[in-house]
């Protein structure tokens, strides 16, 4: 296919038009008085949202060169969302500001490479100062404030803070659609995996069809149990203790399953068998997780162990296990705190190195199950459109809250970015490097300017007053008052603010240093054939 090529100022100008189109669409959502954007969907009702990355992903421009600019900004939003989970609109606004100011200087003859060096130095200084002024998130109230600011709902803030308190900061918190109108929180304590009993005759409660095992022993193996003789000595030892037994194995089949069921029905022995969760290497890892949590040893050939080698010391323990037809929940495993902590650290290190989104999700699930449990926020709303919008807001709030716990918080509403301006201005740079620094100084004001504009105020007036106010004092655009932002609960996670600035500067620098852009030439459509006269065809 033939290519269309633009050079230097023409190339940059075309891309900047795309940047402006996308940024102008996204930035109307910024701040407490931000508006919504309605997105047409191919099927079903339109989506109404104020989520920056969701809007950015939907924008596709007809002009190829403009579309490249728009896609680069969309990448900024996506990258910020991946790293911090929020701050996508701020990142978009910062990108537009850096590109706009940078383009003026490049057009006037400044060297783009020098400008990029200055931008990088200024951003590094700003990030360091953000870390200096950051405050740790120390309690449940602070967590609730972060979530409430991000979701624009105090109720959502309470749900998220309670969920994190119940399942821990590393715990899994999932967001599902509720069947009712109300949003509610449900917490599953302990480790849960999606495998149920192998026979319904193993239940202890015939009405609820669940098996409740109090203070059970737990056998963990990746082997298939088909011959009862393999585990008979172990069963006899467990029988002497009068305690129930949970068997987690690759499968229990052949004569072994009916023998276990028969003993259960006769009341000789309370035993429940379930299949091991996961598949392949992931199954081995999950079995090891269960073993660490319960203090068991996995009976596996990898350790040179056979089923006949299993002893009472090989078994794990827990205060309670509940098994239904689809899932198993292990509560308060008897594994040592040190072993669990080491396992958690191992999974965290794997999380840092993995590049697969699927692997990352599964590792986070394993981490949460070891850390204490799973919380589910069930989102309810009057209509499907409202439900989708609410779900997106809660996802943003959850991500922002995790980021706040990780790196701390700063004054929200763009205030922290203005607070670091003085430190960035101290950078001793010359020539085009100094120009790059000045571009960042101007861009750092832009989020506050846009928040003020969306709320109906003059941004320049707000900026001037903010620069002369104590650090942490800012403008509450929701009611027009000047307040201590942190005390008033208007806060942003450092990770969100930092990621937005770093990603914006990175992509903006790429656009400013672009000298040629290559795009596919649009195909010329052939003219439609003229209609044929039926009389000419013998009719």
UniProtKB/Swiss-Prot annotation:
It catalyses: ATP + H2O + a folded polypeptide = ADP + phosphate + an unfolded polypeptide. InterPro entries: Chaperonin_Cpn60_CS, Cpn60/GroEL, Cpn60/GroEL/TCP-1, GroEL-like_apical_dom_sf, GROEL-like_equatorial_sf, TCP-1-like_intermed_sf. Keywords: ATP-binding, Chaperone, Cytoplasm, Isomerase, Nucleotide-binding. Together with its co-chaperonin GroES, plays an essential role in assisting protein folding. The GroEL-GroES system forms a nano-cage that allows encapsulation of the non-native substrate proteins and provides a physical environment optimized to promote and accelerate protein folding. It comes from the Bacteria. CDD domains: GroEL. Forms a cylinder of 14 subunits composed of two heptameric rings stacked back-to-back. Interacts with the co-chaperonin GroES. This is Chaperonin GroEL.
